[in-house]
Swiss-Prot record:
Keywords: Autocatalytic cleavage, Cytoplasm, Hydrolase, Protease, Proteasome, Threonine protease, Zymogen. NCBIfam families: 20S_bact_beta. Residues 1-53 form a propeptide. The formation of the proteasomal ATPase ARC-20S proteasome complex, likely via the docking of the C-termini of ARC into the intersubunit pockets in the alpha-rings, may trigger opening of the gate for substrate entry. Interconversion between the open-gate and close-gate conformations leads to a dynamic regulation of the 20S proteasome proteolysis activity. The 20S proteasome core is composed of 14 alpha and 14 beta subunits that assemble into four stacked heptameric rings, resulting in a barrel-shaped structure. The two inner rings, each composed of seven catalytic beta subunits, are sandwiched by two outer rings, each composed of seven alpha subunits. The catalytic chamber with the active sites is on the inside of the barrel. Has a gated structure, the ends of the cylinder being occluded by the N-termini of the alpha-subunits. Is capped by the proteasome-associated ATPase, ARC. It comes from Streptomyces avermitilis (strain ATCC 31267 / DSM 46492 / JCM 5070 / NBRC 14893 / NCIMB 12804 / NRRL 8165 / MA-4680). Its EC number is 3.4.25.1. Belongs to the peptidase T1B family. This is Proteasome subunit beta 2. Pathway: Protein degradation; proteasomal Pup-dependent pathway. Its main location: cytoplasm.
């Protein structure tokens, strides 16, 4: 795409030549230097300090899936940002939540969104949910060199499978390894605490309202034990981002909806600081 086309007003030939339905393949052929996996960092001593996103959680319910994230980004032992957004729509029926190096993760999400949009425009149809999960896996794998230098991206992907008519969740490791999770999942620094909370609260017959309450309960428990995870911040009116994906598509809860659930949880926590108690039998 080096040819000067400004004088003629024409698009470069690369844009007019039939090719792959993958936007990443297009970039690899014509501008490979802008792909994340082709960037090389100079040798460094120690860990590179960069803002990191922390905890993402997801749970399924009959009819869909809920994906949510806290709002805190940390850099070492410092709170780098209190209102970062970590959950994004991938397309109409899927979403991705980011944990790991925030800047690289957001860039990866934007590239993923372009990948899905490009495929739909070229093929005239959307990728299956499995196909989307596989494309994201490839992107994560391409970031492995950066991950080895401490700049890992480990997202959580969730969506509504229009073929199977149910919500599904996919988790990843830094090498791009993909696993389908059943019922609930979490990633990030507070994931072990969030997962423990969801393990005790999850059940197969959750309503959408109960599922959104469950993920905020899990994020609250994660923030209670993990300093890198931010809980509901009533003073600053900062609440977790909660998204719901059903047969009607992607929907993000409004700040009013999220705050209403968070405030109800906080009110109950005044009586039970450790949260709801599961039955012993």
């Amino acid at each position: 795409m080096e040819a000067n086309t400004r004088s003629t007003g024409r698009l470069p030939a690369a844009f007019l030549t039939p090719g792959s339905s993958s936007f990443m393949d297009f970039l690899s052929e014509h501008q490979p230097e802008i792909l994340p996996g082709n960037r090389q960092l100079p040798p460094t001593q120690g860990v590179i300090e960069a803002p990191h996103g922390t905890t993402i959680v997801a749970t399924t319910f009959p009819g869909g899936v809920v994906l949510a994230g806290d709002r805190r980004a940390t850099m070492g032992n410092v709170i780098a940002q209190r209102d970062i957004e970590k959950v994004f729509p991938a397309d109409e029926y899927s979403a991705v939540g980011i944990a790991g190096t925030a800047g690289l993760a957001v860039e990866m999400v934007k590239l993923f969104q372009l990948e899905l949009e490009h495929f739909e425009k070229v093929e005239g149809a959307t990728l299956s949910l499995e196909g989307k999960a596989n494309r994201l896996s490839t992107m994560i794998r391409s970031n492995l060199a950066m991950a080895m230098q401490g700049l890992a991206v480990v997202p959580l992907f969730a969506g509504y499978d229009v073929d199977r008519e149910k919500g599904r969740i996919f988790s990843y490791d830094v090498t791009g390894g993909r696993s389908e999770e059943h019922g609930y999942a979490s990633t990030g620094s507070g994931s072990i605490f969030a997962r423990g909370a969801m393990k005790k609260l999850y059940r197969d017959d959750l309503t959408e309202q109960q599922a959104t309450t469950l993920v905020i309960q899990a994020l609250y428990d994660a923030a209670d034990d993990d300093s890198a995870t931010g809980g509901p911040d009533v003073a600053r009116r900062i609440y977790p981002i909660v998204t719901v994906i059903t047969e009607d598509g992607f929907r993000r809860l409004t700040d009013e909806e999220s705050s209403e659930i968070a405030r109800a949880i906080l009110e109950r926590r005044l009586e039970q600081p450790d949260g709801p108690r599961a039955a012993l039998l």
